[in-house]
Design a protein with these regions (language model features):
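Long, highly hydrophobic alpha-helical transmembrane signal-anchor segments
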Residues: 1-24, 90-107
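Alpha-helical transmembrane segments of integral membrane proteins, especially early/N-terminal helices
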Residues: 1-2, 30-40, 78, 141
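Alpha-helical transmembrane segments and their membrane-interface junctions
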Residues: 2-5, 69-93
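Juxtamembrane inter-helical linkers in multi-pass membrane proteins
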Residues: 35-59, 133-148
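Transmembrane alpha-helix/helix-exit interface in multi-pass inner-membrane proteins
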Residues: 17-43
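Membrane interfacial helix-start motif at the N-side
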Residues: 54-71
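Alpha-helical transmembrane segments and their immediate juxtamembrane interface regions
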Residues: 31, 89-136
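Alpha-helical transmembrane segments of multipass membrane proteins
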Residues: 22-26, 77, 81, 85, ...
Length: 151
């Protein structure tokens, strides 16, 4: 039996609730656990395997730009993915609403892709803040060690 509109509303509502809950928990853990912790070593290659810090330009500016882009893309995917899915299904002659199984997986993917981009954007922003704070501490330490001139 095809999926009814009421079932779609329930599935989408539950999925959005789970996505927002996961995003809130992730943001809280970033703050409460202070990830990445400045006492621990942070390996860019492990934590951000697709980010190349040697590609040129200021790392903080690029991280903040990439964080914003990921968050914007995550928000845009919430609206673009259903359109693409419907277009692709019609193009291939499939019915998205024909199977509960297809609908569940489609809605799960629809929410997982934006959620992963939101989380990536938050993490990159947090890393940019960590680097900014570290630079400020280093500049303050150098300024404190600078020779003082008597006037």
């Amino acid at each position: 039996a095809p999926v009814s509109l009421a079932e779609i509303k329930v599935m989408v509502g539950l999925t959005i609730f789970i996505m927002l809950g996961a995003l809130a928990i992730f943001a809280l853990l970033l703050r409460l656990r202070q990830w990445p912790n400045r006492e621990m070593a942070f390996n860019v290659w492990i934590n951000l395997p697709t980010f190349d810090p040697t590609a040129g330009g200021d790392v903080v500016k690029r991280l903040k730009r990439d964080a914003r882009i990921n968050i914007i893309l995550g928000f845009a995917l919430l609206f673009v993915v259903p359109i693409i899915a419907i277009f692709a299904a019609r193009h291939m002659g499939m019915s998205i609403l024909g199977s509960h199984h297809t609908m569940v997986w489609g809605i799960a993917l629809w929410m997982f892709l934006p959620l992963s981009l939101f989380m990536r954007g938050l993490a990159m922003g947090r890393i940019a803040d960590m680097i900014t704070n570290r630079r400020a501490r280093l500049v303050a330490a150098v300024a404190a060690d600078a020779p003082r001139t008597a006037y």
